[in-house]
């Protein structure tokens, strides 16, 4: 029995030895289970077992004389148990307590367990030990597997930590490299900004060229002379009076002089005496004035603003044709309607000149045609003559002298000269009773005077529109044409 107890309660730490001991224990338990019903007979009382006897005389229990148990764990019979002294005869311990081992008496559980038979205790112990061993083995297997997983996980984490450590160690080097590159980049930007300012401006100027400018530096004297000459030439070439004299070639058509308004004696006097108005130009034969228009007549065509015209309409003659009353129009063509307007105009002087200076002078051919025409003149509209549209001078705010302003200045100078010629021609009409020699002398003198005024005006610097307006206010004779 002692061998069984030693096998069961030996602690086993090694797994292999534990398995071997377990197998041996199982074999012994099987052996005991086979022997107990045949050879090992269970006693009727628990106190009749072989290990229960007196420690001094080795006597077993009986019904009349039961055994006794001391507090020091010794069994004594009635003879050897102390009655008065409380000293154990086996161990000599003092002050002991004694209890009778009787079946009828209920013993405490902690005392009764000492007298339980061993096979049931071993079986229960085996079951308990088997249960505990299985639980412990499973727990060990679980922790073993978990430990393996944790080892693998730790190995992976170790690799990650190693890589992170390498990256952290390289971050300091990379930060230094970034700072170096940023410093180089900033230096390059500053240098490019300081050096690249001029090229960008030059490129901007190359892409966007400045706008073209107009050259205003012109020789005034040469330009005025050229424009004055060209204007006079154009006026001579495009003059309706000159063209009409060339086209007619001395032919005379019947006119309507008999039906002209009677309130215009000066105009009728001019129509009746056309040869009075001719002033020979310098260097030409006075006898040739019948074929060419007079300079005074050409000059008077630009000075028609002195009269307040009442527009008229020229009716057709007996032959079904309009009277050949030609005057300059806007485009230089011939218009008979405009000369009819001029012929029927009421001549009202607007300047301090004499009334005789306001007479309209026409070429001989046109005067004859108007004198012999018998068609009446009736007023229809109030439109300004289209022949004077070219001679309008527009007012501009800009005082800079352009090409158009220079032309208007030359026109104003020509108007001034034409005013003198007009006054001279009117004086010649008033003094028609004088001898022809005096008329020729006076016409020559007036022609020279107009030439001198033309030259002086050509040499003068170009005038602005404000200057012309100021001069017109001072002298109504040089009024601008609007």
UniProtKB/Swiss-Prot annotation:
One of its GO terms (biological process) is reciprocal meiotic recombination. It is found in: Nucleus; Chromosome. Residues 240-249, 418-437 have a biased composition (Low complexity). Induction: Expressed during meiosis. GO terms for molecular function: chromatin binding; SUMO transferase activity. It comes from the Eukaryota. Residues 250-263, 440-453, 463-473 have a biased composition (Polar residues). Residues 239-263, 418-482 are annotated as: Disordered. Coiled coil: none annotated. The keyword Acetylation does not apply. GO terms for cellular component: chromosome, centromeric region; condensed nuclear chromosome; nuclear chromosome; site of double-strand break; synapsis initiation complex; synaptonemal complex. Keywords: Chromosome, DNA damage, DNA repair, Meiosis, Nucleus. Signal peptide: none annotated. Component of the synapsis initiation complex (SIC) necessary for the synaptonemal complex assembly. Stabilizes the ZIP2 component to the chromosomes. The SIC complex loads onto chromosomes and nucleates ZIP1 polymerization, a molecular zipper that acts to bring homologous chromosomes in close apposition, which is required for meiotic crossover. May also be involved in double strand break repair. Component of the synapsis initiation complex composed of at least ZIP2, ZIP3, MSH4 and MSH5. Also interacts with ZIP1, MRE11, RAD51 and RAD53. This is Chromosome stability protein 9. It comes from Saccharomyces cerevisiae (strain ATCC 204508 / S288c) (Baker's yeast).
